[in-house]
Amino acid sequence: MKSNDLFRASGIMALGTIISRITGFIRGILIVAVLGTTLLADTYNVANTMPNILYNLLVGGALTAIFIPQLVRSFEHDDGGDDFASRLITTISLILLVLVTLGMVFAPALVRLYAPEFFTTGFETEQEIAIAFTRYCLPQIFFLGLFTMLGQVANARGSFGPLMWAPIANNLVGIALFGGFLAFSPNVDISSITSTQVQILGWGTTFSVVVQALVLVPVVKRLGITIKPKLGLRGLGKSFNLAGWTLVYVLISQLGYLVTVNVATSAAVRSAQEGIKTGVGYTPYTYAYFVMLLPYSIVTISIITAILPHISKLALDGKRDEVKAQLVRAIRLVGVITVPSAVAFLFFGPLITQSIFIGIPTEDSRYIGYVLSALSFGLVAFSINLILIRGFNAFEDTKTQVVSIFVINIIAVAMSYFFLYFLKNQWVTVGLGVAFSVSYLVGLFVTLGLLKKHVGKLAISEFLAQHIRLLSASLLAMLPLYALTKYISWVAPDMTRAGRAGELLLVMVIAFFGYLLTAKAVGVEEISMVRHLGSSITRRSAKTSENE
């Protein structure tokens, strides 16, 4: 795939992801408006994260990383891969049903594992609500698995768009749920929320995931794929062998995330004990991370999804140099978006979150921005690392990449606990953002070194010079604007939310066009790809009703 081809192939996915993220923003704003960012919100977010954690830990990583290459190979079978897909979906579905049942039984233990300080004396209400939310949200595990399996089957047949568009249905249900809740129950807090309201929010959130999965059923049927319930492991042995190392990889990742949730909720409880009213726990981290992932979600995931089946075939054909070239090309293209985004988050984090999260006190929304600025340092390295990991997957090497994620998580865990015990409680979650960034910056060099066994030496110099030019262009465009925002804050410290939103809009428009000009001036060739991506998205938007 050439650079233009990559951007054109990712156009439909980028369009779907953009709309998904817009609706996701609206949903997130409504959730924050309903629950705030303090301990009530933490009980919901910990519980709603639990299905994703357990799913990714036991099944999800293996599905996304391993079974696409296996599905591609199964298409060469006489039945076109229908038997493999049927056995895979049946087997994984049964595993997920067992997992849901066990999770609901042991929900209190799960909450104690991830948020142990909810069990502190005086926080019994938080404990009860968190356990209830967890039980209502855990059935999502089954439908997350169904969504992923159907989506990956479609991806392997070359239909990339539906997997990116289905989350929009999820978000629309969430918007209706939290919008309606806000209209009828606008002032709930940890002491006033009722068990019925907890059920509505918990089961409603799960229903949104059900809808997300079911919209893919007609897509798979339209592709001519026949999936029938079929027990048996024949044909899945190699996949489960490969998945073993992927599960180790995911286990390490989720243990690291366990520490993040643990430390953030601990900071929230301790801050509450000190009388701090601002939300400083897991919820601010969740929404800062959500904003930080926006450019990654729009561009990096789209390009990775488009490139993975292609590089898997190149690896199968023994074209290692071409695999390397595709990875470098993807890194350079992704950098065009992620580098300026990281600089923008660093400079304008609090301004961005103040403008987005309008249903909460200013101090709460500003704190999310501080966490966003801390996370910004790691955005570029995080995106590059994910691309390189797909290189290992193309060669079906799930063992070596475990070393990389182990190093990343050791650094993040060590720094997280350091911050928990040596920072003031209200700044611990900002420290978690720093820990994320540092761990991925170091991990990038580890991953580059490990990938050498498959594609030869892949030196950072192959994209470093371009990234330095991107950084220079971003700084030239945004430093003056950063100084301007500081001046505005000095002369108008009490500006309204609407005023801050207008300020952000002006800054972002000027920064965007300034970046395009400065990037072109410093010789970034890939900057022209932004125009091609925009054209691809626009064309696809016009044709969506016909082709989708």
Regions from the language model: what does each represent?
Residues 1-548:
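Membrane-embedded alpha-helical bundles of multi-pass transporters/translocases
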